[in-house]
Amino acid sequence: MKIIFAGTPEFAATALAALLKTSHEIIAVYTQPDRKAGRGQKLTPSPVKQLALEHNIPVYQPLHFKASTEEGLAAQQELAALGADVMVVAAYGLILPQAVLDTPKYGCLNIHGSLLPRWRGAAPIQRAIATGDDETGITIMQMAAGLDTGDMMYKTYCPIASEDTSATLHDKLAAQGATAICAVLESEETLQKYLAEREVQDESLTVYAHKLVKSEARIDWSMNAVQVDRNIRAFNPWPVAFIQLDENNALRVWNSIISSQSKVNAQAGEIIAIDKQGVHVACGENTFICLTSVQWPGGKALNAQQIAQTQKLHVGQILP
């Protein structure tokens, strides 16, 4: 089949790489415009664009597809002229109007990083960890105009481990998503079968995965240790959990475990021990967490042994 692929980050590039190994023809790739990145703020192509260029696939980077503007209408017409059988969308980042969704012969299929209708929206991986879900997965759906509202065609399941961060779970789901879309697109007959058997989402089970904001990542010591640990893992690798030491300086916290230490009448935020495991801190409900990797402003992330050597934190200190 002739496939258009639309995606931007690594999650999408993993799926594109898998599709490139099939007998299908990737006739075009759509991705977001190049963005400034790194210390030099150089314009950098997305991971999907880089992969497409390596395979000499034409790359399109429209700003939008709004028919109300000349450029949006031109982008729609350009896509239609490609004559695709199907369009695969994974973390593309642009809203696709109904006119685009209806253009390919079999419509547009989306690779979504959750078990829909749970965690529709921008941050399904992070919200699943922060909420304490014990399982997530991939849903392949036929796209509709609403936000992740399309009919479901295929699901795979992925347990969430107690040590999973958004970074590790992202990689697991990216691999699952790649396998899932290849299964659905094994042949034109397979695609027709999954389209015929697609399932409407139960709106009563809908939960939204709202976009992350940096302020959420500030650690609240009044929460119990289990929730603090979930948040630390959910916000790794972005925006990274932090302790606001003073107005201008934040201590980033990359990893943690539930502490086996305890102290009677400890104040929330109080450091009760520093040892080879890390920095043990009192949380709400008389629970305790151990910070195992932290990063001071301008420095590198440190492990437990390195944290102790800095002597920047001390037992009895109350973290804000």
Swiss-Prot record:
The keyword NAD does not apply. GO terms for cellular component: cytosol. (6S)-5,6,7,8-tetrahydrofolate binds at residues 114-117. Its EC number is 2.1.2.9. It is an enzyme of class 2 (transferase). It comes from the Bacteria. It catalyses: L-methionyl-tRNA(fMet) + (6R)-10-formyltetrahydrofolate = N-formyl-L-methionyl-tRNA(fMet) + (6S)-5,6,7,8-tetrahydrofolate + H(+). Keywords: Protein biosynthesis, Transferase. Belongs to the Fmt family. Attaches a formyl group to the free amino group of methionyl-tRNA(fMet). The formyl group appears to play a dual role in the initiator identity of N-formylmethionyl-tRNA by promoting its recognition by IF2 and preventing the misappropriation of this tRNA by the elongation apparatus. This is Methionyl-tRNA formyltransferase. The lineage of its organism: Bacteria, Pseudomonadati, Pseudomonadota, Gammaproteobacteria, Moraxellales.
